[in-house]
Curated annotation (Swiss-Prot):
Annotated GO biological process: DNA recombination; DNA repair
Physiological role: The RuvA-RuvB-RuvC complex processes Holliday junction (HJ) DNA during genetic recombination and DNA repair, while the RuvA-RuvB complex plays an important role in the rescue of blocked DNA replication forks via replication fork reversal (RFR). RuvA specifically binds to HJ cruciform DNA, conferring on it an open structure. The RuvB hexamer acts as an ATP-dependent pump, pulling dsDNA into and through the RuvAB complex. HJ branch migration allows RuvC to scan DNA until it finds its consensus sequence, where it cleaves and resolves the cruciform DNA.
Region described as Domain II: spans on this chain: 66-144
Keywords linked to the UniProt accession: Cytoplasm, DNA damage, DNA recombination, DNA repair, DNA-binding
Domain of life: Bacteria
This protein's domain notes: Has three domains with a flexible linker between the domains II and III and assumes an 'L' shape. Domain III is highly mobile and contacts RuvB.
InterPro entries reported for this sequence: DNA_helicase_Holl-junc_RuvA_I (IPR013849), NA-bd_OB-fold (IPR012340), RuvA (IPR000085), RuvA_2-like (IPR010994), RuvA_C (IPR011114), RuvA_C_sf (IPR036267)
Annotated stretches, region: Domain III: 155-202
Assembly: Homotetramer. Forms an RuvA(8)-RuvB(12)-Holliday junction (HJ) complex. HJ DNA is sandwiched between 2 RuvA tetramers; dsDNA enters through RuvA and exits via RuvB. An RuvB hexamer assembles on each DNA strand where it exits the tetramer. Each RuvB hexamer is contacted by two RuvA subunits (via domain III) on 2 adjacent RuvB subunits; this complex drives branch migration. In the full resolvosome a probable DNA-RuvA(4)-RuvB(12)-RuvC(2) complex forms which resolves the HJ.
Name assigned to this protein: Holliday junction branch migration complex subunit RuvA
Organism annotation: Nitratidesulfovibrio vulgaris (strain DSM 19637 / Miyazaki F)
Chief location: cytoplasm
Pfam family, one: RuvA_C
Gene name of this polypeptide: ruvA
HAMAP family, per database record: DNA_HJ_migration_RuvA (MF_00031)
Length: 202
């Protein structure tokens, strides 16, 4: 069973890329949208944690940038009515910590943002995730008072602060307080508010 692939990008087609190893073997690897969007040009080096899915008529590889994402994919595929393609679509919309946040917040309808998932299917998947997804793995820095997590806004705003030269240990607590006070902020708003707070603290 193939669990890891490293090599250069030979082709990109649809939601997959062909990775050619040093030994000259090419593997077609299906990827989440956010990973696909960050692929280097042809010839660039890549490495993926891989899950091999075997069907009667095909053997498919699904690649992920982190081991956590691969394990979350495996959890999703154990849910009835969720095949590998649906699991990949879910992980194209939500990172593992985003899914944990949905469980913490009891946000069932968020799953309907995934193409092909209606309200009834979302409820079924959500009930399974409650029992199968390790919510305790949600980083403490991503959890607000009352258990809610800022998810993508927190992550993207924190990355923006890092690009501006702020250390994570300095920026994360301030950003957490900003989102605790104003949970509806978008990334730009969270950045502006955090920068003001950081400027006052210096």
């Amino acid at each position: 069973m193939i669990a890891y692939v490293e090599g250069r990008v030979a082709e990109i087609s649809g939601n997959a890329c062909v990775v050619v190893t040093e030994g000259g073997v090419g593997y077609e690897v299906h990827l989440p949208a956010h990973t696909l969007s960050r692929l280097p040009e042809r010839g660039g080096q890549v490495a993926f944690h891989v899950r091999t899915e075997v069907r009667e008529d095909a053997l498919e590889l699904f690649g992920f940038s982190t081991w956590d994402e691969r394990q979350t994919f495996m959890v999703l595929t154990t849910i009835s009515k969720v095949g590998a393609r649906t699991a990949l679509a879910i992980l194209s919309q939500f990172r593992p910590d985003d899914l944990r946040r949905l469980v913490v917040e009891d946000d069932v309808l968020a799953l309907t943002r995934v193409s092909g998932i209606g309200k009834k299917t979302a409820q079924h998947i959500f009930l399974e995730l409650k029992y199968k997804l390790k919510v305790e793995d949600l980083p403490a820095g991503l959890v607000l008072a009352g258990g809610a997590a800022p998810g993508g806004v927190f992550r993207d705003a924190l990355a923006g602060l890092g690009n501006l030269g702020y250390l994570e240990d300095e920026a994360a607590p301030v950003l957490k307080e900003v989102l605790k006070a104003e949970p509806d902020l978008d990334v730009a708003g969270a950045l502006r508010a955090a920068l003001k707070a950081l400027a006052r603290g210096r």
